[in-house]
């Protein structure tokens, strides 16, 4: 991701604040009182940039996440100005229990507004964290409380959805695990959050200019008052500041290369690894030296997964895959990303056996071509909730494309950019079938539906042959066509967008709109809401 990387620089920054007071009253869920006349306490905004800390694990149902700026070392003394939750990249690894009532206080110590979106978690609409759609962005010095029940076990993640193309880019994300009541026990349960950063110092100026331009050009982009006057500026900054070839530092849990800690195991242990892609690029992951099973995708279990070996799991932006294996091959073994891009070799860690005293013979092979894991044919072919030939209340086609508007590149759904894209208008209880078609010649489009899971029914006109696949994020590659289905069982206004957030910012967004639904907040033009 675009990160402001600086070599051997200790950064300190004084944020100039005006009209300071001690007002720190919390927001209620309607989040309506957000005018510019509200003043901030000096203690509510960080005035000195500290270094990041080690990512902590939170295992309770009520806690606080503080959005704050930190200086973060990626590798080899390369420092970035990161935006963090609780001072680390990634933010805390949150683990809650199925059925728990969760209460999270978001405290904003940044100079810009923020929110938290619970990616994949089926929360009430007013807890989804989408500025201008479900809430007003949380202003500097303010606090907002998210409350919901952890209903569906699985591997999820959280991230800012305010100007996400930049704020997620800076590090505002973390993992969110709902542990099931009937979940299998594992001796080791690791979470690996994948990301990519940038070392070209020229990107710093580019990012600063982009942030400033988007702050001016994208203001007021909420569902009640969006217009397209700033479309040209948005597209221009997209193309200027988000050259994917410039990402050359790939990370696992915020570190790259030798700075990534090993994963320790003992012989005979059952090990679970949760892989979360918080970046904007797909990553092909290879586990060396062990047979393994892919037990879930986007947190949803796969029926009777079979054992595989030396297959590459391609994880698209926003997706999650969980694997399990038995530690039955003592030694030191790589878990690494495959590919040819600069930075790929930095995304690797070691599976390291305790008490192993032999010679470690494994070597990285990130350039090798290996078979690709095929989710469409994996697991036991049982009947899911939906079938291709059943009756549906609504059928919809989303033709995804990369197009030109003058000299600018835009990303369209049915040849339109948000907010001109057609919404999916549903009634509660509707069964909805959606055809996703990628007409782009080069770009993947990992499509993410908020507030719902969908079942993948077919790929390129052929029914899936493996386990029923239930997801919230599906990567549609150039030329591919998928049919998915979901039940409209969570009233609200929900985003359905590409999770390459560069594409979303440049137009590839639509909404699922429930008939008769009215949000319980009032969009505030002064909140500077930027839903992508």
Predicted regions and their residues:
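Bacterial N-terminal signal peptides that target proteins for export
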Residues: 1-9
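Histidine- and aromatic-rich segments of cupredoxin/plastocyanin-like copper-binding domains
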Residues: 127-130, 134-140, 149, 194, ...
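C-terminal motif of bacterial Sec signal peptides marking the signal peptidase cleavage site
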Residues: 16-19
């Amino acid at each position: 991701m675009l990160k402001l990387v600086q070599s051997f620089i200790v950064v300190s920054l004084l944020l100039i604040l005006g009209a300071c007071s001690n007002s720190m009253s919390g927001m209620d869920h309607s989040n309506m009182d957000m005018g510019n006349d509200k003043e901030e306490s000096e203690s509510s905004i960080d005035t000195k940039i500290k270094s990041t800390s080690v990512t902590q694990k939170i295992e309770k149902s009520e806690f606080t996440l503080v959005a704050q700026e930190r200086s973060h070392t990626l590798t080899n003394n390369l420092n970035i100005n990161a935006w963090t939750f609780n001072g680390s990249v990634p933010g805390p690894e949150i683990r809650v229990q199925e059925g728990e009532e969760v209460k999270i206080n978001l405290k904003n110590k940044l100079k810009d507004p923020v929110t938290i979106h619970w990616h994949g978690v089926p929360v009430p609409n007013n807890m989804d964290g989408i500025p201008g759609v479900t809430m007003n962005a949380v202003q500097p010095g303010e606090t907002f409380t998210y409350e919901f029940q952890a209903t569906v076990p699985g591997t999820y993640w959280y991230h800012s959805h305010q100007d996400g193309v930049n704020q997620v880019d800076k590090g505002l994300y973390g993992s969110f695990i709902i542990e099931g009541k009937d979940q299998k026990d594992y001796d080791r349960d690791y979470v690996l959050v994948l990301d990519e950063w940038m070392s070209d110092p020229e990107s710093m100026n580019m990012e600063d200019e982009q942030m400033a331009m988007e702050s001016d050009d994208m203001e007021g982009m909420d569902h009640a008052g969006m217009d397209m006057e700033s479309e040209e500026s948005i597209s221009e900054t997209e193309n200027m500041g988000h050259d994917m070839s410039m990402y050359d530092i790939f990370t696992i849990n915020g570190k790259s290369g030798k700075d990534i800690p090993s994963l320790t195991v003992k012989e005979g242990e059952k090990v679970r690894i949760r892989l979360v892609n918080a970046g904007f690029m797909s990553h092909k992951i290879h586990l060396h030296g062990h047979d393994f099973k892919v037990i879930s995708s986007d947190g949803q279990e796969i029926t009777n997964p079979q054992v595989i070996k030396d297959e590459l799991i391609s994880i698209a932006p926003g997706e999650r895959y969980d694997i399990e294996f038995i530690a039955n091959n003592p030694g030191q073994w790589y878990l690494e990303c495959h590919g040819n891009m600069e930075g790929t070799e930095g995304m690797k860690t070691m599976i390291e056996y305790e008490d192993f005293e032999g010679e470690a013979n494994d070597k990285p092979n990130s350039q090798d071509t290996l078979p690709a894991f095929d989710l469409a044919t994996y697991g036991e072919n049982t009947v899911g909730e939906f079938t291709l030939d059943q009756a549906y209340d609504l059928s919809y086609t989303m033709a995804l494309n990369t197009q030109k508007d003058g000299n600018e590149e835009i990303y369209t759904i049915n040849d339109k950019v948000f907010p001109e894209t057609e919404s999916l208008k549903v009634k509660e209880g509707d069964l909805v079938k959606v055809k996703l078609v990628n007409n782009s010649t080069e770009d993947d489009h990992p499509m993410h539906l908020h507030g719902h899971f969908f079942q993948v029914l077919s790929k390129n006109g052929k029914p899936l042959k493996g386990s029923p696949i239930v997801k919230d994020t599906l990567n549609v590659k150039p030329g591919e066509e998928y049919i998915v289905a979901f039940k409209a069982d969570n009233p609200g206004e929900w985003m359905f967008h590409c999770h390459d957030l560069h594409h979303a910012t440049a137009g590839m967004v639509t909404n699922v709109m429930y008939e008769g639904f009215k949000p319980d907040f009032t969009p505030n033009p002064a909140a500077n809401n930027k839903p992508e």
